[in-house]
Amino acid sequence: LDPVIDEYEAYIDWRAHQLLSEDKISQLYSHQSFEQRLVSICRENNEIYPELDIMYLRGKASFQFLKNPNLMKVVSRIIGPEITCSPIQHIRAKLPTGLSPDGSDAHVAPWHQDAGVTWPEADPYFILTVWLPLVQATEENGCLQIIPSLQKKGLLRHHSQAGVGTTIVDEELPDQKILTLPMQKGSILLLNKDIPHRSIPNRSDTVRWSIDLRYQKTGTPTGRPFHPDFVVYSESSPHSVLNDYDTWQQMWIQALEKSRGVQP
C-alpha cells in the first residue's frame, strides 16, 4: 500500500503548490501527515477533492496495485485462476463530516448491496468486493458496518434517495444484528455482492483513506459496460493480463469522455 500512499501524497503536494501560487490557500501544510493534510487544504479550498478517485487521478502505483501479486493470491482462492478487475474501483478520501465540497458527508454510504448498483446483466454472476483501509479505520473516522445475515436473501430492493444515493428500501431491512468493523491499515475485508453494508460518518479531524475494488471471473459481465474492465490474472492465458499502464490510462480517459457525451 505504501507506493499508493506515496503517489497520493506526491499529487496532493503538487496541487498544494499550485493552489498556494494562485493564492487559494495560505500555506502548504507540508508538515502534516497523510491523514491530516488534505483536511487542512480543503478547509481553505476544496478543488483537489473531486480529483482524487482512482479513475480521475489514474496513478501508476494505483494501477499496479489492482493486480498486486499478494492480492491476486487471495482473490484467486475465491474467484479462480481467471480474474478480471471490474471498473467499479475507488480510492476514497473520506473527509470529516460537513467538509466535502457540496456540504454533505463525504463517502458516507447508506445501506446497500454492491449487487444493487450494477446493471442487471451482472446479477447471475459472482463479484467479489475487496475493501482495504490505507489508514486505521475506526468508528470515529467512519469504518464499515455490515449485516451478514441478510446475504442469503439475495438482491434486495433498492431506490435512489436524494442527498443519500442508492440505498436499500427501509422495509427490506428488518431488525438484524449489525457488525461494526474497525480495521487496521493494510487489512482486507472481503464481501460478496449480496452483503448489505454501509459506512458511518467521519467524526474525527482526519481523512479516512480507503480502497474498494471488485473482481470477477473473466468473461462475465461487470454491470458497468460503459467503463473499462481488464484482466489482472490468468493461468491459462498470461499474455491477456493488462500490464501497460498507458493503455489503462487511455481506457479510462476515453470512457469518461464518452460518458460526458464527448467523443475522444
What kind of region is each of these model predictions?
Residues 112, 116-139, 182-185, 190, ...:
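Short, conserved beta-strand element in jelly-roll/cupin
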Residues 97-106, 111, 121-122, 140-146, ...:
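A short secondary-structure junction signal
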Residues 96, 147-154, 208, 214-219:
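Short edge-strand/loop segments of extracellular domains
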Residues 17, 160-161, 188-190, 195-264:
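Non-heme Fe(II)/2-oxoglutarate
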Residues 1-111, 120:
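Non-heme Fe(II)-dependent double-stranded beta-helix
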Residues 137-196:
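Double-stranded beta-helix
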Residues 1, 91-93, 116, 137-139, ...:
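Short, solvent-exposed loop/turn segments at secondary-structure junctions
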Residues 34-36, 107-113, 163-175, 226-232:
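Short, surface-exposed loop/helix-turn segments at secondary-structure junctions
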